[in-house]
């Protein structure tokens, strides 16, 4: 039996013919990185290859390593293996990895979403023989409304809080949803304050040439009256810590795909939940897989067992693959343990939570039945994010990443 072009090893996805790994979870010689979230981009490898938008983020999070970069659809050769990056739409710089060797084509999706969010690049379906896909929201209860509707709901919520003299604290991961939210909030005309972890990502992107809305860094000496009626963006792990008390009186809004399940809002003890995700929903996953025309699909992190089983039932050869992806993903981290207090570094640390799927109480038991639909919540919105692309990094040998 012929050896697979990509092998599943204890270090990660390995292309033996090209002698490189894709998103390895242990140090390796050469790491090809799909995007800068920490479950896909880990320190310690000898060299890294990524999209040039990802490079400043990797530099922020991983530090000083040899980075090689490329743009989308710009092939490079690694020991005779043709490798190219293609837009994944997940976060800034996120890319699918196309690998071609001796007439065989594999695509590693990394994390992806199919809706154009105005900043992450528009997802590009890539035809292949074998497709390795995520399945974070691989159940039919997860179906997203348009970003414009979600932004309209967020804008209305912010306006109501402002009228009541309350600060709007939006919980969103520092790399991804935080940048998407800036355009929505900018449309309100209110000042925007960022938690240290979000601010660090913001500055790395601005320094790399991205045109982003003006913001303020939440600092210990910032007069508290400046926050009143305005907007704060913070990672979800900051909720329930002493840091957040400086914004009193405030309301908390959680931005997450998990808010599709009503019980999760109650567990978070938040004032509002907005179903905003940087991952594809059920329909998005299926549409992408069909568009690839892949003969075989490997399903990684998420609801991989249920999703791979469904693919098999509809006639697509699919296999479940255990990986270490998702352990510090911006979606899965948000629901780890709502009662556990994170480390409380209010200025810099991105407070980490390992991966855990939502608990299945009486309101989430529907997750056990992929064919049963859950009534959708009414959380929606609209506000265009300025689609501004930065000047491209002309250096082909540098690269960055962040979560």
Protein language model regions, located:
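C-terminal regulatory/interaction regions
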Residues: 219-345, 355-356, 361, 368-372, ...
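Active-site regions of enzymes building and remodeling cell-envelope glycoconjugates
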Residues: 29-35, 45-52, 63-71, 80-83, ...
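His/Asp/Glu-rich metal-coordinating catalytic cores
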Residues: 2-17, 21-26, 30, 36-171, ...
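Short acidic low-complexity segments
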Residues: 12-25, 74-77, 214-230, 236-244
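Long, charge-dense
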Residues: 193-211
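Cap/insert and terminal regions of metallo-dependent hydrolase folds
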Residues: 115-196, 256, 260-329
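Short coil/turn segments at beta-strand junctions that form active-site/ligand-binding loops
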Residues: 29, 46, 104, 165-167, ...
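Short, polar loop motifs at secondary-structure junctions
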Residues: 24, 34-39, 52-57, 72, ...
